[in-house]
């Protein structure tokens, strides 16, 4: 038999349903995914995976140097390290150059550190892109050309996934765009080169510790052969690539290469005229959840007010 409920009960039920809806909408925003982090690999200006060969010919590394098991060092010129050198085992050293380490030389396993860097690459590559560029690639090859990448959030990473990146004599600018401590992830699945007078800069708060260039998979050699005008920002993360660099360029960030080694011997080849890495490795964003949008907050407040009013009428 159908029951007819009192109108007062129906009104209260409807109001409580509206309140519940307000609570649900405010709650569906949820928390952002865990931030991308390099973990124990974050202090390294230069980190090489196992069985890798480093050729240095006027190479300065700011921060720490990490050499993994079975690595080889060919000193064609000098290699200087302003932090500590962490070495897994005894690397093979050849050539007539020299090296100096301002801090300590520490022997330790690098396995977990390499794994942390590789995990960062995998996690970054799994992010859904929320930025885009025409043609799904960046090609800036003239000093009169430039591209600006603007942040759209600081509650999660600003992610751009492209098929290739070629920067020659032009510039890429990262813009925090009014957000505080925005983070940028640029996933590159194909060729990657920043050569000649390539320039990467940050404005409105963006800096080298906010940017990762995540060069995914196996493929062509990462080309960082510049000149004295080359100035780059960010952590260059290339777990399965060879890297060439030189020509007097400067990277404010870090270079991490070969940390996903499945039997391949990768190389980092620094040619003449020097190269300088000033350590400012990637720092993760805050792990706090998303801030609800003002409309959601207003709806939540309205729901609470309605609930209070309903209870007062009920008491009467």
Locate the predicted segments by residue:
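N-terminal leader/signal peptides at the extreme start of proteins
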Residues: 2-7, 285-288
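Primarily marks folded extracellular/lumenal domains of secretory and cell-surface proteins
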Residues: 32-288
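Bacterial N-terminal signal peptides that target proteins for export
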Residues: 4-17
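Bacterial N-terminal signal peptides
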Residues: 14-26
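Compositionally biased, intrinsically disordered low-complexity regions used as flexible
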Residues: 1-4, 301-303
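A short, hydrophobic C-terminal helix/tail in secreted or cell-surface proteins
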Residues: 292-310
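Short, charged juxtamembrane terminal tails flanking transmembrane helices
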Residues: 313-316
């Amino acid at each position: 038999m159908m029951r007819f409920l009192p109108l007062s009960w129906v009104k209260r039920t409807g109001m409580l349903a509206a309140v519940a809806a307000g609570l649900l909408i405010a709650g569906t925003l949820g928390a952002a995914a865990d931030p991308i982090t390099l973990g124990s690999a974050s202090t390294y200006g230069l980190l090489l995976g196992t069985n890798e060969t480093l050729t240095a010919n006027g190479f300065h590394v700011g921060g720490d140097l990490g050499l993994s098991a079975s690595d080889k060092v060919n000193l064609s010129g000098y290699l200087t390290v302003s932090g500590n050198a962490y070495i897994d085992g005894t690397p093979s050293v050849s050539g007539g150059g020299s090296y100096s380490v301002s801090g300590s030389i520490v022997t330790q396993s690098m396995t977990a550190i390499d794994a942390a860097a590789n995990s960062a690459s995998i996690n970054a590559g799994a992010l859904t892109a929320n930025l885009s560029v025409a043609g799904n690639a960046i090609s800036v090859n003239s000093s009169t050309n430039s591209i600006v990448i603007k942040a759209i959030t600081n509650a999660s990473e600003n992610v751009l996934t492209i098929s290739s990146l070629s920067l020659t004599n032009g510039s890429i600018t990262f813009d925090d765009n009014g957000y505080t401590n925005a983070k940028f992830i640029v996933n590159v699945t194909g060729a990657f080169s920043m050569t000649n007078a390539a320039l990467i800069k940050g404005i409105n708060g963006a800096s080298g510790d906010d940017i990762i260039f995540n060069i995914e998979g196996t493929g062509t050699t990462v080309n960082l052969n510049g000149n004295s005008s080359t100035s780059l920002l960010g952590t260059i993360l290339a777990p399965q690539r060879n890297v060439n660099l030189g020509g007097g360029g400067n990277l404010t960030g870090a270079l991490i290469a070969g940390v996903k080694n499945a039997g391949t011997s990768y190389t980092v080849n620094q040619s003449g005229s020097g190269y300088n890495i000033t350590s400012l490795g990637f720092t993760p964003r805050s792990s706090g959840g998303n801030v609800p949008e003002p409309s959601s907050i207003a709806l939540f407040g309205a729901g609470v007010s309605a609930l209070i009013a309903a209870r007062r009428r009920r008491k009467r």
